[in-house]
Amino acid sequence: ARTILKYGAATVVMAFDEEGQATTYDRKIEICGRAYRLLRENLDFPPGDIIFDPNVLTVATGMAEHFDYGIDFVRAAEWIHANLPGARVSGGLSNPSFAFRGNNYVRETMHTVFLDEAIPRGMDMAILNPSAMIPSESVPEALRLAIRGVLFTRRDEEATELLIALAEEIRLRKEAEK
């Protein structure tokens, strides 16, 4: 961090510590809070140059412990903005949709829906492929609701099964169009 500060660069702080990657809301805010305090108190690191990545993780895996990964990221982004003045939030958008690799349309739609929810709640920047973004207004409502269910609202096995069924339907339709 001293070298980064010496050159006047910003730093991206991943929500990892000695115990590993933060996967829950509580661990994300614990690690980000600790890192912020260390950077500010020990180095007087400019708060606007501290960018946190509170780990956007894969959803719709069928594993119950993954149900809250989408909402936990967004809640952590809100907490960072409310409690760590000046800090910013980033995240890699390919992660939450990884369970749908091979179905690019569903993955790209998930990225759009994720940003629609995460930006107003504190996500300042994202690591993404801009040429693969789908305009928000072109996302079919049924797919938007299914994705929101998996990422933010229902977060259960039924929501996952609904999105998987829609993804398969879309995949088959796209294959038939070829």
Which residue stretches match the model-derived regions?
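A structural motif corresponding to the C-terminal end of an alpha-helix
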Residues: 38-47, 79-87, 121-123
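Active-site beta-loop-alpha junctions enriched in small/polar residues
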Residues: 14-19, 55-62, 92-98, 130-131
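Generic structural signal for well-ordered alpha-helices
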Residues: 1, 29-37, 70-81, 115
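Hydrophobic faces of well-ordered beta-strands that scaffold small-molecule active sites
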Residues: 11-14, 50-54, 87-93, 124-128
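Conserved anion-binding
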Residues: 1-59
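Flexible glycine/proline-rich, aromatic-decorated loop/lid segments
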Residues: 1-12, 86-95, 107
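Active-site loops and adjacent core secondary-structure elements that bind or stabilize anionic groups
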Residues: 78, 84, 95-178
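Short glycine/threonine-rich loop-to-helix capping motif typified by GTGT followed
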Residues: 26, 59-72, 100-109
